[in-house]
Amino acid sequence: MEFKDRKLIFDDSTIYFIDKDSQKKHFVMMDWEHNIMKAHADYACSNGGDILEIGFGMGISANYIQQNNIKSHTIVECHPAVTNNAYAWAENKPNVNIILGDWFDVKYHLGLYDGLFYDTYGDTKAKQLKDYLPTFMKNKGVATWWNSYNEKNNQLGIKADSYSIIDVNPKNNNYFKFNKYYLPKKEFK
């Protein structure tokens, strides 16, 4: 079953789903990520201008992106329930454009951006992002992405220019087990 077809459960501090076979919770996003999301948003917005956010989740990074001096904020989200939350969140935010769909399926409808933040769950095309990332970026644009590992083991295969190291204290979850988070940074020239 694809992620976009799963029934998600939203509460104040998490998004998760229950695996039908194992009956285990699979966490999609949790509120302990705030400082990571702020750092990603601040880097993605470091040039101002037009920002592309792939994945909305709980809207944590979107809130931080909106706190920056930006021109536009395009959000691509594949899960219909998360997209509905994004539409509600974007009400009265005229610089926000929400696109329902997988980034790979809508890639030719996207423009050029000064900054990009990629953080999705269950993206079967994630490893292809490295091939398309340059086509989304303006000259001197910057990109960052969720990194579940470390600076030597980047699951997307994108070569970062540098990393910021953030101390974290993750709650019990099934997607991040470390006390240090390596935030990847990439500039396009």
Regions found by a protein language model. Give the residues of each.
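Conserved SAM-binding motif I beta-strand of class I
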Residues: 72-77
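Class I SAM-dependent methyltransferase Rossmann-like catalytic core
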Residues: 1-49
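S-adenosyl-L-methionine
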Residues: 78-110
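C-terminal substrate-binding/active-site "lid" region of AdoMet-derived donor-dependent transferases
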Residues: 81-82, 124-189
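Conserved SAM-binding loop of SAM-dependent methyltransferases across substrates and taxa
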Residues: 58-70
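Conserved class I S-adenosyl-L-methionine
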Residues: 47-57
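A generic alpha-to-beta junction signature in SAM-dependent methyltransferases
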Residues: 45, 69, 90, 135-141
